């Protein structure tokens, strides 16, 4: 996609019903890898909004994606109201275009959408305290619980086979066979690591196929920075980045949070000696998550959560390494070998999880381990 200029941004902003003219700043907002995110505000500075260009290379059906987002947020608003909450803060609120559409298509084929800005909130890039991590866990568990009766059949699949780990493995094998940039020679140990875990990739989908765990409506990208936390009270407010809300497994959402939160390093830490999986933080998160989502989960589903942590971390590493082999087209990179560093960090975490996996199972399912 072409870069976003101030004139392009202003043109997109003018298409939305912000209640009056808005001012734009062409500096990107936030830490997201995929979409282009900006903050705009009314000329009188009375209100801010998020304006975002959807990455249509990744999300090829932006209209369908926005149907998902609008349907899910409408459902969440009803739940939040019924629980006595504040739907203006506790879920995303979509701003329509002036013509009443959920997104705006620009002259270059770019797709734009807008949300109310949720003020006085923060999102964590790394876990700052156990309390913060438990708050994230409780918020994500509540989100899943609020969606337990959402009609999954109405959802568009925004990214086909997104958490299909065997398919991610197959895509890696294709990229390895093609070796388009001649990079495979640099990563022999990483290749061996993935090959040794081919069977692990099938564990969760085999459990689903056997009817041991249920298909749910899940977020599918529950990095800790996708939860907004009230800056004053420290309470969890809102789950954001709903682009990948689709039918999925509870293990996916649980696992991705552990992947990003239960360690003391950045996702792209180049020094592997600094990468440490924190079993205690895993336990903190598990207890928080199960406190809000666990009542409707079977023993088998709770047990699958530990596998989710392990497989989402493995899968993410496979994705980073696949992108490295293919030329770094999917994830934004800031330096050479950025995706390789990301992959190595994931694989280090997987190794460490494997060493304490019995304890991980015991924590999520103490009565049936």
Predicted segments with their positions:
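Conserved ATP-binding subdomain of kinase catalytic cores across diverse folds
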Residues: 25-174, 248-250, 261-262, 266-273, ...
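Conserved active-site aspartate in kinases
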Residues: 241
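Small/polar glycine-rich anion-binding or flexible loop at a beta-alpha turn
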Residues: 302-312
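Long, compositionally biased intrinsically disordered regions
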Residues: 353-356
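ATP-dependent phospho-/nucleotidyl transfer catalytic cores
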Residues: 27-31, 52-53, 59-63, 118-134, ...
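Juxta-kinase regulatory segment immediately upstream of eukaryotic protein kinase catalytic domains
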Residues: 1-26
